[in-house]
Structures are given as C-alpha cells and as structure tokens.
Amino acid sequence: APVCMIAPISSWAAAVSSTAEGLDTGISGIQLFIKAIPYNLYSLLTFVFIIALSFMQFDYGPMRTYERKAQETGDLSALENAEDEAVNPKGKVIDLLLPVLVLIAVCTTGMIYVGGFFGVDAWGGTDCAGDFIGAFGNTDAFMGLPWGGIIALLFTVIYLVARRVITFKDAMACIPKGFNAMISPILILTLAVSLKATITSLGASIYVHDLMEGAAATLYSMLPAVIFVVACILAFASGTSWGTFGILIPIVTAIFPASSELLIIGISACCAGAVMGDHCSPISDTSIMASAGAQCDHLEHVATQIPYVLTVAGVCVVGFIVAGFVQNVYITWAVSFALMLCVLFVIRSMERRKAA
C-alpha cells in the first residue's frame, strides 16, 4: 500500500484523482496526486524505517518474539490448513518481471497518450505535445490505465502460453478470478465518488469553509496533523483507504485555498493517514491478502505490524506539524527522516537493555 500510494501509475492514483476531480483545487486530480507525493510522509518514512531496521538488525514488539521463535525452532507459524501449491518447473523469474515491466511501460504510454504527449489529446487540444510532465497532468487516468491493463493482459497471456508455462485454458480461467478480486475495490470507489457528490450537494464544503474562515493561522498550520490522525482512525475502523479518500478529500479542499501549499500538504496527510489505517486494520483487504499470501495467522500478522506502523505514524504526526508551519518539503524531510532514525536508535537501545 505505501508503494501504491506514491505511484502515479496505479489504481490508487486513479482513486485519489477521481475523488479530487471537479473540486475547487485549481488543478486536475492527477496533478494534485503527483504534487502530494513529496509530502506523503507515511509512505516515505516506511521506506526509511524498513531500510534502517534491516541495517540495524533488530526487531521489537510481537515481531521480535516470532522472529526469535523462527530462528531458534524453525517454526514459521504457517497456517495448518494452507494448501500446498504445486511448483511449476517451467516458471522463471523473467515470467514475473517481464509482464510487470510491460504493464508499467504500456500504462505510462497510455496515460501520456491520453494527455496529448504525441499530439492531440483526449480533449482535442495540442498544448502538451512533447511535454511529458504536462501530458501527465493533463491525462485522464480512467482512460489511460484500462488500455494499459488490457494490452499488458494480452501480452502476458500470449507470452506465458507461448513459453508453455501455462495452457491457454488455464490462462482464461485466471481472468474471471481477477475480475472477482476487483469487484470490492470497484464498489468502494463507486460509493466513494457517490459520497463525494452527496457531500458537495449538501454544501458541506461551504459550511467547513465558513467555519474555518475565522480560524487562527496557528490552527490552520496544525490541521495537516489533525487530518492525518482523523484519516488514520477512519481507515482503521472502516478497513478501506479508498472510502477515506471519498470522505476527507472534499472536506480538505474546502478548508484550504486552492493556491495554498497547505492544500497539497492536507491532501498528502489524508492519503498518508488512509494508507496507515488501511495498513494495520484487521478488516482491511490489503492486510488480509498479505497474511494469506504469507500463509500466516491473520491476527498474528496484524499484531506484529501495529507497533511498527504506530512508530512510523508517530513520526508522521510530528512531520505534518512541521510541514504545516514551514510549508517546505526539504525541511520537512530533514526533520522527519532524522527523527525516524533517532527513534529507531532509542528503541534499539531499549531492546538491548531488556535482553541484557
């Protein structure tokens, strides 16, 4: 989830941009998403956390218990009823990597094509010809991504069948399973867009704007941190980050002026909080798929994740407070990354004292 949240070529980008499209932001939905990436502290700090933890070679919380158990006894706590999947001797690493690379390349090409990079865009204009960044900002993710997905799917089927990794019959049997897996996200996105329309029709944006108009500048600067915490709680309780986008993004755009840097920071805080809550929620589809893929007990997976997630989230709160006041991405990064490393050093010191 943290990776998808900062990837412009993903269904998550489409979810955020579609929710923000048509709101009073002054830019397109995909442009808003791209501008929000540098301030998405949860995703960025998660990478820092993982890399630092790997180099420092320690664990804490329930994860430490399970890691020690695995090292000493070899017990990986695999599910007892997990099915033993037959290993295909014909499969190679390239069979996984090549379709993914084709998907990325074709989706990128599809999005800049719709945005007008190669000439006339989907809207009939020619302003973005040869302008990669401009074409990305002018694109419609819901037009570009499906074409990329369809072409990549066709390539994958032809490639794997030609290599005789799977039969054509097996390939066709996988397609309905893929459609079934996407029913829930599509329904969530549809309901989120409907909720956005309802909020707009009720005039919630006008109410929130009037409510915040007389607020002190200090309160405005603290709002990104508040938005992050609210998004965390909402996503954790509901188990869906996409639904959180639909609820909070229209409210965030009503709070901050379209030309304000705080609007970008607020959207980033919303996205970061939604991913954080979704990341550790026991009813989240991403958590369920992660535990199922690792063949471990679902509640044990959630229990081992929560201390790590809360550590990153705590640093994010401080980071968004700093971002709200300084409104400078480089200062925000410096403070957040330094604090993340300091927190890990302190935790490692505490764990060593416990072990002594």
What are these regions (language model features)?
Residues 3-5, 90-110, 151, 180-196, ...:
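Selective recognition of specific alpha-helical transmembrane segments in multi-pass small-molecule
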Residues 1-63, 234-246, 267-293, 304, ...:
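Alpha-helical transmembrane segments and, especially, the helix-loop junctions at the ends
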Residues 18-26, 59, 108-121, 161-168, ...:
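Transmembrane helix-loop junctions in multi-pass membrane proteins
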Residues 156-233:
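Helix-loop-helix junctions that connect adjacent transmembrane helices in secondary transporters/permeases
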Residues 186-192, 217-259, 263-264, 270-278:
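Hydrophobic alpha-helical transmembrane segments of multi-pass integral membrane proteins
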Residues 51, 104, 108, 157-158, ...:
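Alpha-helical transmembrane segments of multipass membrane proteins
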Residues 39-41, 92-95, 145-146, 179-185, ...:
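Membrane-interfacial loop-to-helix junctions in multi-pass transporters
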Residues 31-33, 46-138, 150-174, 297-306, ...:
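Long, contiguous bundles of hydrophobic transmembrane helices that form the permeation core
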